[in-house]
Amino acid sequence: MILQSNSIAQQIADEGGVEAYLHAQQHKTMLRFLTCGSVDDGKSTLIGRLLHDTRQIYEDQLSTLHTDSKRIGTQGEKLDLALLVDGLQAEREQGITIDVAYRYFSTEKRKFIIADTPGHEQYTRNMATGASTCDLAILLIDARKGVLDQTRRHSFIATLLGIRHLVVAVNKMDLVGFQESVFTQFKDDYLSFAEQLPTDLDIKFVPLSALDGDNVASPSEKMDWYSGPTLLEILESVDVVNARRQQPLRFPVQYVNRPNLDFRGYAGTLSAGVVWVGQKVKVLPSGVESTVARIVTFDGDLTEANPGEAITLVLADEVDISRGDLLVDASETLKAARNALVDVVWMAEQPLVVGQSYDIKVAGKKTRARVENIQYQVEINSLTQRVVENLPLNGIGLVELAFDEPLLLDNYQRNRDTGGMIFIDRLSNVTVGAGLVREALASVYQENHDFSTFELELNALVRRHFPHWGARDLLGGK
């Protein structure tokens, strides 16, 4: 284990120095995944095992781990690998995970960002936060307990939040004698439940022991009846080809960069599609068109940018653009929605009620929304729907919202950035919920050939800088 603790330094040496090592890391594909399941299924231990077996632990960390394992560990004489991840003092002393803990590690094939999410029901909102940026979910099942309510809850939330790759890991197989029948039974149980989930899921199953490392990074000699890949092999090989490249261009403007009179750029992260120099783009909601003149980054100009890249676009024309505006391909006609049906994960003690107004943020755009009605709340255990008057803490339901101004929205399953929103309490400024757009309602087309480009720009300018004039949006907004 001491040898493993020096492995990162050894990897740097093998690559020929720090710069060569960093260059190799930059060109690896990235997989974001989370671990979730019921209470004490071994999520933090599994992450600790992955870090340990992929040689991501430094000597001082290992020394501290030995000391802490003896003082507050839960595994007797063995290393308590969960302590590598459970950072909060309350977590370490209780042996549970409360907050979402993020960790980074890499192998020769891929880079990973892990979100260790809490298993307790009262922290389901934390799990939803962790799942919102992930491509794959590891659902841990305790081999002594089987598929539990929280496992079903997390499966539903993960798929609701757009995750299509699920790995069902039956953990603690050492406590049931590594019996194949136990693994097979829980696999059948989960597949029976999964019939209620979306049909386009990629579900894989693996039996393992996170504490001892069986089938985590190396095959288990104690489960020779299992001929499938190890967990790490699944993580390294799962197909996460970024389908966002094939999607329509979406570039939400986060910041207008104007350091001097000679430069005006629009900074943000490319959400979907590909943008290139010379491409014709349209600015929404104004509808003004222009051409991409430059794609600026910290490392120099690009000729083309891909989804996920933080860039600054310079347009060929002087156009009035502000934070919250959206750049799309000039050939596209995108609708702005006055109302929308939104799947809501509620995160506040105070329930969501009909008639209440909240501030919301969508892709950098901030406005106000009113709850028109709650169509139903999902009963997580059975995935049935029931009529409710309010949506409580950790509740998930379908809600109709009415916006103060038309918003440019996509279905969340199509685009997380332009289809996802957060609810903010207007008094405390606390985030109280997450919304996932299912359907835009009462839309108006942004194309309107009755007005010239000058008229549209002037109208947008007046509404932005002279709101007390009460000017109406020429495209149908307020």
Curated annotation (Swiss-Prot):
Stretches for region G4: 171-174
Keyword Nucleotide-binding in annotation: yes
Region of interest called G5, as start-end residue ranges on this chain: 209-211
Record region (G3): 116-119
One function term, GO molecular function aspect: GTPase activity
EC number of the protein: 2.7.7.4
G2 as annotated region, ranges: 95-99
Enzyme class: transferase
Keywords for the protein's UniProt record, in alphabetical order: ATP-binding, GTP-binding, Nucleotide-binding, Nucleotidyltransferase, Transferase
Source organism, top-level taxon: Bacteria
Catalytic activity: sulfate + ATP + H(+) = adenosine 5'-phosphosulfate + diphosphate
Pathway annotation from the record: Sulfur metabolism; hydrogen sulfide biosynthesis; sulfite from sulfate: step 1/3
Domain tr-type G: 28-244
Segments of this protein annotated with the region G1: 37-44
Binding site for GTP: 37-44, 116-120, 171-174
CDD domains: CysN_ATPS, CysN_NodQ_II, CysN_NoDQ_III
Biological process according to GO: hydrogen sulfide biosynthetic process; sulfate assimilation; sulfur compound metabolic process
InterPro entries (alphabetical): CysN_GTP-bd (IPR041757), CysN_II (IPR044138), CysN_NoDQ_III (IPR044139), G_TR_CS (IPR031157), GTP-eEF1A_C (IPR054696), P-loop_NTPase (IPR027417), Small_GTP-bd (IPR005225), SO4_adenylTrfase_lsu (IPR011779)
Record flagged with keyword Transferase: yes
Subunit: Heterodimer composed of CysD, the smaller subunit, and CysN.
Purpose: With CysD forms the ATP sulfurylase (ATPS) that catalyzes the adenylation of sulfate producing adenosine 5'-phosphosulfate (APS) and diphosphate, the first enzymatic step in sulfur assimilation pathway. APS synthesis involves the formation of a high-energy phosphoric-sulfuric acid anhydride bond driven by GTP hydrolysis by CysN coupled to ATP hydrolysis by CysD.
Family as reported in the entry's similarity comment: Belongs to the TRAFAC class translation factor GTPase superfamily. Classic translation factor GTPase family. CysN/NodQ subfamily.
Designated name of the protein: Sulfate adenylyltransferase subunit 1
Organism listed in the record: Yersinia pestis
Gene: cysN
